[in-house]
Structure formats: C-alpha cells, structure tokens
C-alpha cells in the first residue's frame, strides 16, 4: 500500500508541480538531479537482484573474490592467454574426435562421450567464441594481480550497473541537444521507460558467463553512443576529437564483447560522415583541407581499424580466416555446421520480443510471460520461457505509428538527418539483430542488445509531434499518456522480471510473504 501511495504522490507531482511541467530549457539542473536519482535507484535495484541471486543459491551475499574456479570467460580464456595461446588448455577426448560428426548432439549423447558444453571444437582443440574484451579489461588483469578469478555475478553487476549509468547519461545528452522544448514530466517518464525496458535486469537475475558478454556489450554500446553525442558531430557546438575517439573506441570494444554489436559501429558511420563535413567546413580547401581532416579521421576511424584488425587476427589465429568468429563450431544442442534458415524461426523472435501481449492474472505479480512458438514445426532452442513484447514493456514504442506525421512536420534538412542518423540506430540495427537470432533460439537476455535503442526511436517521434504539431489540449493528453506509459512499463517489466527470478532457494518463504503484501485484499 505504501508503494502504491508513493507512486500516486509521484504522479500527482508530475502532473501538478509547475517546475515539473516546465521544459528542459527552463529547468535543466532539476532534470539532471532527477536523472541522477533515477539512475542511483536503478543501480540499487541491480545490486539487490544480484544479492538475491547469490543468497538464494549459496546462502552468501557475495562471491569469493579469491576463488580458484570459474567458467570459460572468467577462467578458461584467462588461463589460455596466460599460457600464450588462443586455444583452451583442456584437450578434447579421443572419443569425441573419433565421432563422424562431433557437432551432432545425438551422436555425442549416443556415444556417451565427455565434452565441454557450449565450447568451440575446431581442428582437434577447444576454443571459446565469447568476446575477449571482458577478459582483457577485467578478468586477466585481476588474475595477474591476485592469482584468483573474478566472480561472475559481481562482473555482471559491474558491467550492467555502469551500463545503466551511461544509458542515463546518453539520454541526458540526447535531451540537451534535441529535446529542450519538451516538458520535464514527459522526459522523466521517458527515462523510467527507457531504463525499465532495456532488458539489462534479466542479466542480474541469472548472472552466468552468457550475461558477462551481454552486459559488457551493453555497457560499451551505451558509453560509445553517449560519447558520440557529446563529441558534437551532430547538433550545435564544436567537434570534440577526444570524445569522438572515445566513442569509436567504446563502440569497437562493444564488438569485442559481443560481435552482434558491430551493427552499431556501422550505424555510427553516418554520424562520422556528418561530423567530418562539420569539422572541415570553411576551414580550408584542396590539399589543405585534407591536412585539416587527418586528426578527425584518426579520431573517428583509427580505433575501428585497430580493434577490428585485432579481432580479425584473433579469428585467423583460431580458425584460419579473418572473418570467421567460430560460432558454427559450437558444441550445443544445435549443429550449427548444418543449420538451415527458416523464416518461421525469425517470426518467433519478432513476435516474442516485439508483440507478445503478457498474461494478466489476479495473482502476484499480476503480469506474466506469454511466450509462443507460433505452432512452428521443427526444433527451436528455447533458453528462457519469458516473453513480453516491447510494445507493452515500453508503450511509447507505439510512437512509430506517428512516423508519417513526424515526417510531414520536418523540413528537408531534418528529414535527411532522421534518415541518416536516427533510422540506423533505432530501427535498422535493432531489426537486423532481431533477424539474426533465429539461429541461436530465444533467450530474453538478447533484448539487451536492441531494446532501448528501439524504444528511443518511438519516443523521438512523439517528441517531434509534441513540439511541432500538437495543440495545447493534445499536449496535455500526451503528457498524461507518457505518465501512464511509465506506470505500465514499470508494472509490466517488474512482473516479467519477478517471474524470471528463481524462487526455490533459501528465500522461498520470503518471496511468498512479498506476494501476500501486494495481495492485500486477500
């Protein structure tokens, strides 16, 4: 009841207080302070979810930071790099190598051979297809300093919490540059929706080595896009080469965490081209302009060249090909060496990540997953049976239906910028990522790669409609709609995350008591 009362008071303040109905241009400091509070609360929630996971399984709140065990990211890759090799130290068994097709799960099961699950098998050696950036930046230095292995849950918390911070900073910079005429109550609701629907929370509930790749990629993508805005390549102000270099360095590092995120490097190229024209405009002509452009090109492209070249050399050292990341050599249920494309599998991902309407029940937490395989024939890997479409987890995503009206409200220059800048980051990259997961199956954590970017695009359309086309009464309706969307986003995401958490450990009775607190009418 107290939580409901606090939420009601917050909504009352957002709808009535003049300072919260003022625009960002009128109250920039206030919005900055509120952003800091929302971010701090989000990080506290991340800590709480991690502690719940830890205690529910071991009865201890924190991991052993002097542990001598780990997984293929925290230990096996660390040991391999320490030994000066790219293959893992453990050798495949002769029985495994003797199989006609060791990538066939049924053959491995029938023969009863031992093998490392979800590792790569190539040319008689084990490898890992997970990105090397977390290893080089955290796990390997920690091992060299302490002789121990950094624990996985705390690593996921570290990467995820920093990602939450930089997502807020990105949104603050986005507002500062493009949304100064939008009221604070809309912006506050938007930040709540953006953070709630980012998908990073699922990683704290089940922090395994998969989630290391997911959260580290999330961190460096948010950091890179924030620095890209701060660099001034678009919007007012001069171009900052230091921030630009940091942006491409971060986005390139995200690829070394999770190769799928290379799409955001590609999406950044129109930003870099636009910034190049801005940086060199009126400064020189002919060859003199080339000399002026060299520092910009180095800051913008050199990190991509160095990091991309390093990844290609790493690929070649393992698989004899610069462009082979090795995913097809995985020892899992699916034989990726013989994988066949099926449009039905693509549809499963699009439906569950974007459209699936969650189940509503009169039992806590009231909102439940509604995953569907769409009656597809054949085997489709399901890692986590937890689904709720982005349209319902972030109702402002419906803003895309106003794209035609927003397009008509823009002049030619703004249309060009929207096509070159907003479309690649918020629409094309998320859509391609969604398309690409058909081969891997469904896991709710995958939304961490694209969710907030897709949500931002819908919000941007609504902001433009508010500023350009809405009358006074329509603006009031939009303000209320954003607040309602924030409440729905908070409720739906909280319910889905609660349903994703395990409740069969030390805290089973406490989870039951929590549910009874909300079911106060029973």
Protein language model features and the residues they cover:
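Interfacial juxtamembrane loops and adjacent helix segments
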Residues: 83-130, 144, 171, 195-204, ...
């Amino acid at each position: 009841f107290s939580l409901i009362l606090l939420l009601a008071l917050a909504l009352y303040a957002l709808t009535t207080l003049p300072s919260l109905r003022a625009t960002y241009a009128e109250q920039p400091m206030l919005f900055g302070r509120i952003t800091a509070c929302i971010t701090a609360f989000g990080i506290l929630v991340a800590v709480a979810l991690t502690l719940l996971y830890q205690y529910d399984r071991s009865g201890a709140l924190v991991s052993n930071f002097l542990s001598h065990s780990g997984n293929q990211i925290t230990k096996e890759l660390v040991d391999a790099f320490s030994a000066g090799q790219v293959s893992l130290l453990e050798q495949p068994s002769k029985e495994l190598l003797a199989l006609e097709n060791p990538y066939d799960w049924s053959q491995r099961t029938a023969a009863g051979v031992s093998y490392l699950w979800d590792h790569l098998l190539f040319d008689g050696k084990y490898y890992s297809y997970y990105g090397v950036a977390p290893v080089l930046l955290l796990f390997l230095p920690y091992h060299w300093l302490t002789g121990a292995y950094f624990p996985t849950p705390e690593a996921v918390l570290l990467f995820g919490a920093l990602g939450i911070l930089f997502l807020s900073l990105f949104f603050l910079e986005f507002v500062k540059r493009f949304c100064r005429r939008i009221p604070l109550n809309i912006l506050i609701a938007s930040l709540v929706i953006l953070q709630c629907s980012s998908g990073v929370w699922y990683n704290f509930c089940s922090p395994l080595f998969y989630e290391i790749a997911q959260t580290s990629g999330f961190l460096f993508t948010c950091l890179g896009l924030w620095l890209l805005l701060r660099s001034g390549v678009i919007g007012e102000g001069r171009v900052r080469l230091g921030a630009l270099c940091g942006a491409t360095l971060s986005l390139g590092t995200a690829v070394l965490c999770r190769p799928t995120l290379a799409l955001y490097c590609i999406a950044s190229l129109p930003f870099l081209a636009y910034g190049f024209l801005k940086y060199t405009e009126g400064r020189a002509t002919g060859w003199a302009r080339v000399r002026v452009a060299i520092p910009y090109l180095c800051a913008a492209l050199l990190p991509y060249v160095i990091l991309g070249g390093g990844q290609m050399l790493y690929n070649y050292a393992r698989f004899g090909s610069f462009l082979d990341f090795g995913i097809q050599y995985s020892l899992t249920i699916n034989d990726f060496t013989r994988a066949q494309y099926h449009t039905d599998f693509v549809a499963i991902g699009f439906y569950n990540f974007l459209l699936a309407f969650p189940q509503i029940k009169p039992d806590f937490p009231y909102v439940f997953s509604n995953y569907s395989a769409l009656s597809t024939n054949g085997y489709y890997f399901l890692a986590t049976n937890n689904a709720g479409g982005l349209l319902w987890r972030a109702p402002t995503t419906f803003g895309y239906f106003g794209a035609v009206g927003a397009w008509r409200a823009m002049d030619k220059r703004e249309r060009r910028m929207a096509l070159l800048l907003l479309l690649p980051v918020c629409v094309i990259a998320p859509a391609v990522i969604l398309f690409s997961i058909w081969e891997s199956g469904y896991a709710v954590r995958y939304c961490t790669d694209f969710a907030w970017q897709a949500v931002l695009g819908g919000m941007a359309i609504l902001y433009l409609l508010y500023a350009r086309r809405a009358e006074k009464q329509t603006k009031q309706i939009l303000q209320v709609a954003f607040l309602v969307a924030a409440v729905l986003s908070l409720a739906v995401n909280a319910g889905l995350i609660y349903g994703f958490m395990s409740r069969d450990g030390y805290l089973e009775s406490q989870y039951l008591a929590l549910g009874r607190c909300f079911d106060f009418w029973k």
